[in-house]
């Protein structure tokens, strides 16, 4: 018989004594699931001791095979989730490259925004940068082209000024549509003290000043007879206008770079849509 200590221990641990086949007591925990019944043929083969038969049954190949299949099925089902997670968490090479480029763009734009406010490292140059900003604004260019068209006496001058006016209107429309589609916010260090802004000017991609500077520079160099120093001055002006957008914190570097690219190809579109005096007269005649 078990000692009183064994009984007290079994009572505390939540076990119940059960007589075995050899006359000894076994303690079965109530917290565990009862073992599966032993096949009667196995009992007959191994003798009358149920403990020995139960141990032999647990080591039988059938039981091992069943447990292995259940583990493999569980493991196979669990492996699907990591594969799906890997598909979600592993972006493509293009996504990684784009994220890296944007991170470099934001870092470089913040480092170059040295005139973003008066307290910046180059804050004393900010008034000059704002003057360059006005020189590339759309309103002075539209007003200047319309005035030159009105004052021009020669048909050739009127043709050039008319197409310049058309190019400026086309630039404003294309940049406004693209800004409304992309909707990229301006840099966080930008101060909204810009000259004559509209609703789409709260977005930064692409830079309208950069597109206008690149397009107007190509237009002037191809349709005006300028001396070599003036041609260099036009190119220098277009470059400074684009660079000033980053110094003032108005745009990121990629906004200006794409703006130059877009303005360069906008000029090709203007050449395709060029309005000659003959085409203009025929259009006016059709309207009348």
Swiss-Prot record:
Biological function: Magnesium-independent polyisoprenoid diphosphatase that catalyzes the sequential dephosphorylation of presqualene, farnesyl, geranyl and geranylgeranyl diphosphates. May regulate the biosynthesis of cholesterol and related sterols by dephosphorylating presqualene and farnesyl diphosphate, two key intermediates in this biosynthetic pathway. May also play a role in protein prenylation by acting on farnesyl diphosphate and its derivative geranylgeranyl diphosphate, two precursors for the addition of isoprenoid anchors to membrane proteins.
Keywords from the UniProt entry: Endoplasmic reticulum, Hydrolase, Lipid metabolism, Membrane, Nucleus, Transmembrane, Transmembrane helix
Protein family (similarity comment): Belongs to the PA-phosphatase related phosphoesterase family.
Protein's name according to its UniProt entry: Polyisoprenoid diphosphate/phosphate phosphohydrolase PLPP6
Region (Phosphatase sequence motif I): 179-187
Enzyme Commission number(s) from the entry: 3.1.3.-, 3.6.1.-, 3.6.1.68
Catalytic residues of the enzyme: 209 (proton donors), 251 (nucleophile)
Ranges that cross the membrane: 128-148, 162-182, 224-244, 256-276
Listed GO CC annotations: endoplasmic reticulum membrane; membrane; nuclear inner membrane; nuclear membrane
Chief location category: endoplasmic reticulum
Chain segments carrying region Disordered: 1-82
Lumenal face residues: 149-161, 245-255
Positions of the record's site feature: Stabilizes the active site histidine for nucleophilic attack: 255
Signal among keywords: no
Region (Phosphatase sequence motif II): 206-209
Family annotation (InterPro entries): P_Acid_Pase_2/haloperoxi_sf (IPR036938), P_Acid_Pase_2/haloperoxidase (IPR000326)
Molecular function per GO: sphingosine-1-phosphate phosphatase activity
Region spans: Phosphatase sequence motif III: 244-255
Species assigned in the record: Danio rerio (Zebrafish)
Reaction(s) catalysed (UniProt annotation): presqualene diphosphate + H2O = presqualene phosphate + phosphate + H(+); presqualene phosphate + H2O = presqualene alcohol + phosphate; (2E,6E)-farnesyl diphosphate + H2O = (2E,6E)-farnesyl phosphate + phosphate + H(+); (2E,6E)-farnesyl phosphate + H2O = (2E,6E)-farnesol + phosphate
One Pfam family cited in the UniProt record for this chain: PAP2
Membrane topology classification: Multi-pass membrane protein
């Amino acid at each position: 018989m078990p000692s009183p200590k064994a009984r007290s221990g079994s009572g505390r641990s939540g076990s119940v004594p059960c007589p075995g086949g050899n006359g000894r007591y076994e303690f079965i925990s109530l917290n565990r699931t009862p073992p599966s019944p032993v096949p009667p043929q196995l009992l007959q083969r191994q003798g009358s001791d149920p403990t020995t038969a139960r141990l032999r049954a647990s080591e039988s190949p059938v039981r091992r095979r069943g447990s292995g299949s259940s583990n493999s099925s569980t493991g196979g089902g669990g492996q699907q989730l990591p594969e799906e997670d890997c598909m979600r968490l592993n972006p493509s090479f293009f996504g990684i490259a784009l994220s890296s480029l944007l991170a470099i763009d934001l870092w470089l734009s913040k480092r170059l925004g040295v005139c973003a406010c008066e307290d910046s490292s180059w804050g004393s140059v900010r008034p000059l940068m704002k003057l360059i900003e006005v020189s590339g604004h759309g309103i002075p260019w539209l007003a200047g082209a319309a005035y030159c068209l009105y004052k021009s006496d020669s048909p050739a001058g009127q043709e050039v000024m008319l197409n310049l006016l058309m190019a400026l209107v086309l630039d404003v429309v294309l940049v406004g549509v693209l800004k409304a589609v992309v909707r990229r916010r301006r840099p966080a260090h930008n101060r909204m003290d810009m000259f004559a802004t509209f609703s789409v000017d709260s977005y930064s991609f692409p830079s309208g000043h950069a597109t206008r500077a690149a397009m107007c520079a190509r237009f002037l160099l191809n349709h005006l007879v300028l001396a070599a120093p003036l041609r260099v001055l036009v190119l220098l002006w277009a470059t400074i206008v684009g660079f000033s957008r980053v110094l003032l914190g108005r745009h990121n570097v990629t906004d200006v770079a794409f703006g130059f690219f877009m303005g360069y190809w906008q000029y090709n579109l203007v050449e395709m849509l060029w309005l000659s005096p003959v085409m203009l007269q025929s259009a006016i005649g059709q309207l009348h």
